[in-house]
Amino acid sequence: MFPPRKFLLSSFILAALHVTAAPLWDAKDPEQLRFITSRCMEDWYPKAKNPKAALQNWLGWKLEPSDDQATQCYTKCVLEKIGFYEPGEKRFKGVRVMQQWETFHKYLNADREKVHDLTSTFDFIPPLKSSSCSEVFEAFKKVNGKHSETIRAILFGKGESSKKYYQEKGVKIKQKEQSLFMHCEALNYPKGSPQRKDLCGIRKYQMGSGIVFERHMECIFKGLRYMTSKNELDVDEIARDFIVVKKKPDAMKAMMKTCKANLKEKNPGKIAVHYYKCLMNDSKVTNDFKEAFDYREVRSKDYFAALTGKLKPYSRSDVRKQVDDIDKIQCS
């Protein structure tokens, strides 16, 4: 046992380490959580033994069938992308559970004591032998069985909490059923602003300039996850959009490798513009990129549309019409 003074000092040091480490992870807002869960569902439900049944379970916050590898890997995917599980450490991160609650507690219907219990439960799980889907799932299943309501609450899984957050943040966050592009346009080219006159050309792939355009491209590239929060390029995310419209991403990937190597900018907005120019200026890539970019605008309205059957099979002409309709609104 620690003597009282040493115990207090040790507790202070541990608390300080937790505080120091906290900024390395950012709590997740409803928009981020919707993106994470929908993306993990897209990746894993087709691999389930009964895809339709598994998807319905996951949409209802039920991690079933528990013996299906797809369910196990979906769970691991969500936990890793949120940050509640760190594969490199093979550990669950209880401190992040509390950080999630502390960041958003005024919106959440979650009791602090229950959140504290969940935090402690995570922290008491020893490092796993591996970060396999089955091992992560088995460890989490025991926690979820006892704390499922609290987990759902801190992850904005109850409608009223996310509704309050969206209402308070307004134009500062992409709203449900709002395309990511229109969100960024409302922030950077709002109606009545002097720069609004530039928006129509930008929507039609004319290159903008200045700090407003830089902020706009940063908003879009980070919102689409083409760039990470640390300003790193995620070329696989761009490739994913190419594949969805049945375009091969190989030429784009090779070109973007060179583009990244030539990057000299440090400012996030300038970095986004640099990457955008590369995609627009390469004659072998630009037409496919525009097609992929247009469809991503349409799909960004509802992250769950492809999962719930609301998204029609891809048709270039249908997408072009939808984008033209948006242009009419934004160019007026």
From Swiss-Prot:
Disulfide bonds join 40-77, 73-133, 184-219, 200-331, 259-278. One of its GO terms (molecular function) is toxin activity. GO terms for cellular component: extracellular space. Disruption phenotype: Mosquitoes show longer probing times when fed on mouse or chicken but not when using an artificial membrane feeder or mice deficient in leukotrienes. Reduced blood-feeding success, defined as the percentage of engorged mosquitoes after a fixed amount of time, when fed on vertebrate hosts. (Microbial infection) Significant reduction in the numbers of oocysts in the mosquito midgut after infection with Plasmodium gallinaceum, the causative agent of avian malaria. Induction: (Microbial infection) Up-regulated in salivary glands following dengue virus type 2 infection. Residues 1-21 form the signal peptide. Leukotriene E4 binds at residues 61, 157, 176. Saliva (at protein level). Female salivary gland (at protein level). Detected in the head and thorax of the female mosquitoes, where the salivary glands are located. GO terms for biological process: sensory perception of smell; vasodilation. Noradrenaline binds at residues 185, 203, 216, 294, 297. Lipids and biogenic amines bind independently through different binding pockets, with lipids binding to the N-terminal pocket and biogenic amines to the C-terminal pocket. Interacts with human CD4. This is Long form salivary protein D7L2. The lineage of its organism: Eukaryota, Metazoa, Ecdysozoa, Arthropoda, Hexapoda. The gene is D7L2.
